[in-house]
């Protein structure tokens, strides 16, 4: 089976171009199995704000206490994931919403005590996911379940998406409000792994892009053939990426 993992950023979910679903239907008609992974940071922040809970971050990662976890789980599963599945089904693209608990999709462990209920994926149930792909478009949110302590955990959605891509040895399209990796304010079309550390050391890659490219580097080292970072608000962006005719950045082992 040929898979493509598509990570849809929280900022893109509310402004997702309608052609994305049609492009995904087209992939499936060609026996390519897309897997959607999403987070929902802006929606979580809004839900926390409505409950007068201030979000707290350490080193760019959300600290998730028990109250925050309850709201995060409800927001991602009941609100964001359900709404996304509904969009797909309304366009006659049969989708199924999943978290890590469903079909024992993936196992997790606690990331670090200081971050509270934040987990990292450890094992992907490839058999379950492969079977679901033959029937539906899986739409996976970033909530996992820890079988050892019986608790739900929040997972960084980028980390989860890269983990799934590496486990399946599949390419990943990372769609957000970012057009690609910028060097001197210009989107670079290719970023070989060997150049990443140099760009970071020189300050050309900085801020929130650093964890994105380092996660991409790790995914490629673990089996993902390539990572594409592009804007999810462009028409027919998935088809354009598949046909290698797009504005964005392809991160890969070596330049082509």
UniProtKB/Swiss-Prot annotation:
InterPro entries in the record? AceGlu_kinase-like_sf, AcgluKinase_fam, ArgB, Asp/Glu/Uridylate_kinase
Residues marked Transition state stabilizer (site): 7, 212
User: E.C. number, please?
Assistant: 2.7.2.8
Binding-site residues for substrate, renumbered to this chain:
40-41, 62, 154
Q: Could you state one GO cellular component term attached to this entry?
A: cytoplasm
Role summary: Catalyzes the ATP-dependent phosphorylation of N-acetyl-L-glutamate.
Q: Which organism is it from?
A: Staphylococcus aureus (strain MRSA252)
Recorded protein name is: Acetylglutamate kinase
Instruction: Check the record and name the HAMAP family matching this protein.
Output: ArgB (MF_00082)
**Annotated pathway, please?**
Amino-acid biosynthesis; L-arginine biosynthesis; N(2)-acetyl-L-ornithine from L-glutamate: step 2/4
Question: Which top class of enzyme applies to this chain?
Answer: transferase
Q: Which GO terms describe its biological process?
A: arginine biosynthetic process via ornithine; L-arginine biosynthetic process
Protein localization: Cytoplasm
